[in-house]
Structures are given as structure tokens and as C-alpha cells.
């Protein structure tokens, strides 16, 4: 039985003081919550303080990071290694977010390397996949997502997929725009992704993978989206 996961990507919001205040507030609001995992992904500058706050309070909230560089160390100015994140107690790492693909120009091979590096450091990548509005309107949404999955997971085994992977479907046209895919749209892609995983890695492995939806999720639509199987 998959445990639902709710992950919050804070993007470039909150300095380290504001992040600590927010995670303390969240921790209080989530007291007694059962049957779901919650992860927060603050900016890099706040990771250490948020990690310490979660540890000191014994919070069940799991720490996540927004990105990573696929090397253990070296002359990579401005980058953060998987080992550094693991040392802070990070559990989940977002890789391939559409904003990094679109704004920074990250390609599938780099996303694949990041996902592998996160896995090998004992953390779980949240692999982001999704299509543009143009691709959806041209009927290419499925082929786009399939290409991203194949590029990122070509070297993975069924055991690795079943224990070390989360996939986030994030239609690019719905991110930060106020537009949201309908629950039926999200479920259609969810079904395709799980079917692709089953064909590639076997039904048992596919059934263990948690598939998230991201894209203008709000309190008034979260329930409908979470209700999709």
C-alpha cells in the first residue's frame, strides 16, 4: 500500500528565518496527522536551519531539496552535491523541474545524472515530467512524458524504481499560471506513467511508485486531485 506524499516546493521564497517560522507553523498544524508523508523543500540557504528545527522538534516532516548537482565534490561553483544534502538529513530531492528545464536549459541527460546521483547517495529523487500547452494541444503530451521517463530511467532496475523513486507530473502550462489540469487530465497521465513503469519494470515495481501532481494546486482543488487513484 502506497503512503500518500505531499511535497511543498518553496522555490525562491523565504529566507532562513522565515523558513524556520513557516516550518514551525506547519509542524503545529500537522500534529496528529497520520497516513501521509509530508516533505518541505526550502531554498538551499534555509536547509540547515530547517533541518535543525525539524530535528529538535522531532517533527515527522521530511526535508527535501529543490535541486542537486551530480558530482560528489569538485570545482562546480554554486552547486550542491548529493553528499552535502544527505549530511543535512535530506530525504527527497527534486530533479528535472520544468523551471530548471525551461529557464536554466537543463537537458534530459543532466536530469538523468541527477536522479542517479540522488539514488546512489541513499535519497529519493522526485523526478518531474510534463508537457507544454502547445504539446498538449498537438496531442504530444504522452510522447513528451514518455521521452522524459525513458531518458531519466533507462539505467534503473525494478528494485531501484520500487524503493527509490517518486515521479511528479507537472504540466508546464499549469505551473504558476493559475490554470490547473482537471483531476481527469491528471489521472489520465498518472495511468499512462504507471502503465509505462509496469511495462518497463514489472507490475510489482510500478505499483510501489508514488506519482504526484504539481501545477497550481490550491486548497479548493487539492482534495479532488488526491482522490484520484
Can you describe what each PLM-predicted range is?
Residues 1-229:
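Active-site loop-to-helix "anion-binding N-cap" substructures in soluble metabolic enzymes
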Amino acid at each position: 500500500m502506497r503512503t500518500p506524499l505531499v511535497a511543498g516546493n518553496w522555490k525562491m521564497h523565504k529566507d532562513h528565518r522565515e523558513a524556520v517560522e513557516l516550518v514551525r507553523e506547519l509542524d503545529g498544524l500537522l500534529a496528529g496527522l497520520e497516513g501521509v508523508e509530508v516533505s518541505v523543500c526550502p531554498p538551499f540557504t534555509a536547509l540547515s536551519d530547517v533541518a535543525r528545527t525539524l530535528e529538535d522538534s522531532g517533527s515527522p516532516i521530511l526535508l527535501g531539496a529543490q535541486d542537486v548537482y551530480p558530482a560528489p565534490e569538485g570545482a562546480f561553483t554554486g552547486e550542491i552535491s548529493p553528499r552535502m544534502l544527505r549530511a543535512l538529513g535530506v530525504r527527497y530531492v527534486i530533479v528535472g523541474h520544468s523551471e530548471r528545464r525551461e529557464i536554466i536549459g537543463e537537458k534530459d541527460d543532466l536530469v538523468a545524472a541527477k536522479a542517479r546521483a540522488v539514488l546512489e547517495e541513499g535519497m529519493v529523487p522526485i523526478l518531474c515530467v510534463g508537457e507544454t500547452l502547445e504539446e498538449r494541444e498537438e496531442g504530444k503530451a504522452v510522447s513528451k512524458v514518455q521521452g522524459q521517463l525513458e531518458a531519466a530511467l533507462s539505467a534503473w532496475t525494478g528494485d531501484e524504481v520500487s524503493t527509490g523513486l517518486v515521479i511528479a507530473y507537472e504540466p508546464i502550462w499549469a505551473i504558476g499560471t493559475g490554470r490547473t489540469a482537471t483531476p481527469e487530465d491528471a489521472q489520465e497521465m498518472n495511468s499512462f506513467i504507471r502503465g509505462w513503469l509496469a511495462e518497463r519494470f514489472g507490475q510489482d515495481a510500478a505499483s510501489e511508485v508514488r506519482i504526484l501532481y504539481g501545477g497550481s494546486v490550491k486548497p479548493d482543488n487539492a482534495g479532488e486531485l488526491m482522490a484520484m487513484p
